[in-house]
């Protein structure tokens, strides 16, 4: 990477402008810039331009905008019958914004297929700060003994939610977290869940890949709009089975049937 002519962001100036996401490199694909810091001002500026940080310990902060972009329309989440059986069988409790740091820390744990993690302690500190400011949110899945077994976190901006990472300690726990997130986003009027990188796992649940230029157009549109006033309020309740049934009734996906 040392031979790449890459824009460098001044770490002392959080207002230092990002290059356009349209100018991202072809190799490494989607790399926009390096350097800077993880201050709230810079992070929110990045997300507003369709750019996010992704790097490993020991590297400079690297900023990305991949093409194509992974997205999921909240009302198009596919509830497969196996996931529906899990919902009916498991006595799990789902909350949001009750354990943001614990969710991030769990997401940072090494996976069986990877030795390291991109969720560094600096990242945890930065996103916890955004959570305190009301910009970052989490969904938590708890087992019947009160153990945290799954979750997801991300950034909210207008009617767009940027999903960052999720984890699972029990089969389907992360899928349940993503389902509840999608359902709440849909009810609250959000139009798009940005999953950043396309994947077969997310495509199985209704995700898709769209060209970056299309994503940036949606980004500009939806970040200028506002979700429902009760979005992310702790007293908001949602019957997930009623939501799933309503989506099946609208023809969103035949596998969503509650029967």
Predicted feature descriptions by range:
Residues 1-259:
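N-acyltransferase acceptor-side catalytic subdomain
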């Amino acid at each position: 990477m040392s031979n790449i002519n890459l824009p460098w962001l001044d770490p002392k100036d959080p207002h230092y402008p990002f290059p356009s996401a349209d100018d991202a490199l072809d190799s490494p694909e989607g790399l926009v810039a390096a350097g800077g810091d993880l201050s709230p001002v810079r992070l929110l500026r990045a997300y507003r331009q369709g750019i996010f940080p992704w790097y490993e310990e020991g590297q400079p902060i690297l900023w990305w905008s991949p093409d194509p972009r992974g997205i999921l329309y909240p009302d198009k989440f596919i509830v497969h019958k196996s996931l529906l059986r899990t919902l009916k069988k498991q006595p799990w409790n789902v909350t949001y914004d009750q354990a943001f740091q614990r969710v991030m820390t769990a997401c940072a744990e090494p996976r069986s297929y990877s030795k390291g993690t991109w969720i560094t302690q600096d990242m945890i500190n930065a996103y916890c700060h955004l959570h305190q400011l009301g910009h970052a949110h989490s969904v938590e899945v708890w087992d019947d003994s009160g153990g945290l077994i799954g979750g997801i976190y991300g950034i909210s901006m207008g009617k767009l939610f940027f999903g960052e990472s999720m984890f699972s300690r029990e089969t389907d726990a992360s899928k349940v977290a993503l389902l509840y997130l999608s359902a709440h986003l849909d009810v609250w009027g959000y139009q798009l869940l940005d999953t950043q990188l396309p994947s077969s796992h997310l495509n199985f649940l209704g995700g898709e890949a769209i060209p970056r230029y299309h994503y940036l157009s949606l980004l500009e549109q939806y970040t200028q709009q506002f979700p429902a006033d009760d979005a992310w309020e702790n007293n908001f309740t949602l019957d997930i089975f009623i939501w799933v049934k309503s989506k099946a009734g609208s023809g969103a996906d035949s596998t969503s049937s509650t029967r």
